[in-house]
Curated annotation (Swiss-Prot):
Zn(2+) 2 binds at residues 169, 172, 191, 194. PANTHER family: DNAJ HOMOLOG 1, MITOCHONDRIAL-RELATED (PTHR43096:SF52). Belongs to the DnaJ family. Zn(2+) 1 binds at residues 152, 155, 205, 208. Its main location: cytoplasm. The gene is dnaJ. InterPro entries: DnaJ, DnaJ_C, DnaJ_domain, DnaJ_domain_CS, HSP40/DnaJ_pept-bd, HSP_DnaJ_Cys-rich_dom, HSP_DnaJ_Cys-rich_dom_sf, J_dom_sf. CXXCXGXG motif repeats lie at residues 152-159, 169-176, 191-198, 205-212. This is Chaperone protein DnaJ. A zinc finger (CR-type) spans 139-217. The lineage of its organism: Bacteria, Pseudomonadati, Pseudomonadota, Alphaproteobacteria, Rickettsiales. Binds 2 Zn(2+) ions per monomer. Participates actively in the response to hyperosmotic and heat shock by preventing the aggregation of stress-denatured proteins and by disaggregating proteins, also in an autonomous, DnaK-independent fashion. Unfolded proteins bind initially to DnaJ; upon interaction with the DnaJ-bound protein, DnaK hydrolyzes its bound ATP, resulting in the formation of a stable complex. GrpE releases ADP from DnaK; ATP binding to DnaK triggers the release of the substrate protein, thus completing the reaction cycle. GO terms for biological process: chaperone cofactor-dependent protein refolding; DNA replication; protein refolding; response to heat. Homodimer.
Length: 376
């Protein structure tokens, strides 16, 4: 392998522009044919190598390309193109041919591209659907209505009139872009003739104007599985907008919102509710019928001495879960109700109860201890 350009100039690969310039001027002066020692037959050759090296390394973009592909890429291309040919390029060929891959990386594929397809995938759609808690528990099928782009039923998505076909764009060769020389680089531009599609529709469909789709109001039945939670997103593949000129459809995403319930508050798979009971049931215990989310009622046992704010649990009576037979629990928060309007008999009974309570020791500190515990 011959010397690379850094070796020719006698600098490291990390040399800055000032170092390059200094090294170049020193060597150019030394090996200039007018200054070279008499009889030095290699001076002219060396001088050309120095100029070629500096020509590449002083340019940031050329230097980046040289660092990436190496010295051999230049030598090989020069051998193929012939010295001094190809329009005066210093390496015997258009430098853009040497670095086609380099341009592809930085320009989005400007080197050797294959013809592009005129098909474009349709956009995804989002639909917000509100359901009640019972529907979330049982699952439900809902009919929704929305507007979107649909596949043209006249041209079947091709964009051409019936019997017509598309042709490859002769301006870009089906690539969808043309290349324009701007100094050292070849710059890609969207083809003005096919607008980047790569195909030309000579006789566009009159219904969809060559797009292969048109706008329409749609009705769709969507299935909501049992156990969905608030904020659940359900994907319906292929139910989004139709693609352009036969491209694949997008997807439809249904976002679920659950209405607040009159009785229950949702906490994951558990349900919370307030349970009002009489002070008699709280003191003596008993059973009360409570409604459940699946419909109907179940009996809940109230232990004797239940206090206001106590929490009673009904296992397996909460929300269902998606793809599971396990349910959450229902938690009833006790609210002891004290009657405001007493009958004569009720008052008499309570007075008797108070009289019995008065016979208990009132100076044992228990009342004050309870008060203290409430404030501690």
């Amino acid at each position: 392998m011959s010397q690379d350009y850094y070796q020719i100039l006698g600098v490291s690969k990390t040399a800055n522009s000032a170092d390059l310039k200094k090294a170049y001027h020193k060597l150019a002066k030394q090996y200039h044919p007018d200054n070279a020692a008499s009889g030095d037959t290699n001076a002219e050759k060396k001088f050309k190598e120095i100029n070629a090296a500096y020509e590449v390394l002083k340019d940031e973009q050329k230097r980046a390309a040289y660092d990436r592909f190496g010295h051999d890429a230049f030598q090989n291309q020069q051998a193929r193109g012939g010295a001094g040919s190809q329009g005066g390029h210093p390496f015997g060929a258009d430098i853009n041919d040497i670095f086609g891959d380099f341009f592809s990386d930085f320009m989005g594929g400007g080197g050797r591209r294959k013809p592009t397809s005129s098909k474009v995938r349709g956009s995804d759609l989002k639909y917000n659907l509100t359901i009640n808690l019972e529907e979330a528990f049982h699952g439900v099928e809902k009919n929704i209505s929305f507007s979107s782009e649909v596949k043209c039923d006249t041209c079947h998505g091709s964009g051409s009139e019936k019997g017509e076909t598309t042709t490859t764009c002769d301006a870009c060769g089906g690539v969808g872009a043309t290349r324009v020389q701007q100094g050292f680089f070849m710059i890609e531009q969207t083809c003005h003739k096919c607008q980047g599609n790569g195909q030309i529709i000579k006789n566009p469909c009159k219904k969809c104007h060559g797009l292969g789709r048109y706008h329409k109001q749609r009705n769709l039945s969507v299935n909501i599985p049992a156990g969905v939670e608030n904020g659940t997103r359900i994907r319906h593949p292929g139910e989004g907008e139709a693609g352009i000129r036969g491209g694949n459809n997008g997807d439809l995403y249904v976002d679920i919102a659950i209405k607040p319930h009159d009785i229950y508050k949702v906490d994951g798979a558990n349900l919370h509710c307030k349970l009002p009971i009489s002070f008699v049931n709280a003191a003596l215990g008993g059973e009360v019928a409570v409604p459940v989310i699946e419909g109907g009622k179940v009996n809940l046992t109230i232990p004797a001495g239940t206090q206001n704010g106590d929490q009673l649990r009904l296992c397996g009576k909460g929300m269902s879960k998606i793809r599971s037979t396990i349910r959450g629990d229902m938690l009833a928060h006790v609210h002891v109700e004290v009657p405001k309007n007493l009958s004569k008999r009720q008052r008499e009974l309570l007075e008797e109860l108070r009289g019995e309570s008065a016979n208990e020791k009132e100076n044992d500190g228990s009342f004050f201890n309870k008060m203290k515990s409430l404030w501690s």
